[in-house]
Amino acid sequence: MADGGGGGGTGAVGGGGTSQASAGAATGATGASGGGGPINPASLPPGDPQLIALIVEQLKSRGLFDSFRRDCLADVDTKPAYQNLRQKVDNFVSTHLDKQEWNPTMNKNQLRNGLRQSVVQSGMLEAGVDRIISQVVDPKLNHIFRPQIERAIHEFLAAQKKAAVPAPPPEPEGQDPPAPSQDTS
């Protein structure tokens, strides 16, 4: 986990995503209303699935989720919950392998898969990941992640609202303003 790779699995920061349909909505596809034009986010009510999909797609395109993931991964291996989980898994694996009688014809893939299943079934990963999240992610939620997300949403909605307002017609070029009348009566 500390190598910076992976992501997208259970417990991975930023691993969630939108479906293909909602990703299509975020690119300007028409909505279920059949209006034929792109979706205007400013016209959608808060909590609308299309609005959420548009916002998530915008956050992804800005790289916010990747930034959050990198921020958390840089911090994770310094936390006691991670070190504790790593030690538990190391001990579990050592104990499991000590119980195996080695012979050269052993199927290593079967052994590895059996070990993986045992680790998952033990429940230690789920509990350990929950503790890691509470030590790494939770402290960053309100002070780091939420302000960045809110700022990005406000900028996105403001840009969409600005784009939805038609520009005033341009001033006609080459015409002089009307000359003041010179009435000398």
Curated annotation (Swiss-Prot):
Per the record, which residues fall in region Disordered? 1-45, 160-185
Compositionally biased residues, Gly residues? 1-18
Q: GO cellular component annotations, sorted alphabetically? A: centrosome; cytoplasm; nucleoplasm; outer kinetochore; Set1C/COMPASS complex; spindle microtubule; spindle pole
Q: Which InterPro entries match?
A: BOD1/SHG1_dom, BOD1L1
One of its GO biological process terms is: mitotic sister chromatid biorientation
Which keywords does the record carry?
Cell cycle, Cell division, Centromere, Chromosome, Cytoplasm, Cytoskeleton, Kinetochore, Mitosis
GO molecular function annotation: protein phosphatase 2A binding; protein phosphatase inhibitor activity
Q: Does the keyword Cytoplasm apply?
A: yes
Q: Where is the composition biased (Pro residues)?
A: 166-185
Q: Which domain of life is it from?
A: Eukaryota
Q: What does this protein do?
A: Required for proper chromosome biorientation through the detection or correction of syntelic attachments in mitotic spindles.
Q: What is this protein called?
A: Biorientation of chromosomes in cell division protein 1
Q: What is the lineage of its organism?
A: Eukaryota, Metazoa, Chordata, Craniata, Vertebrata
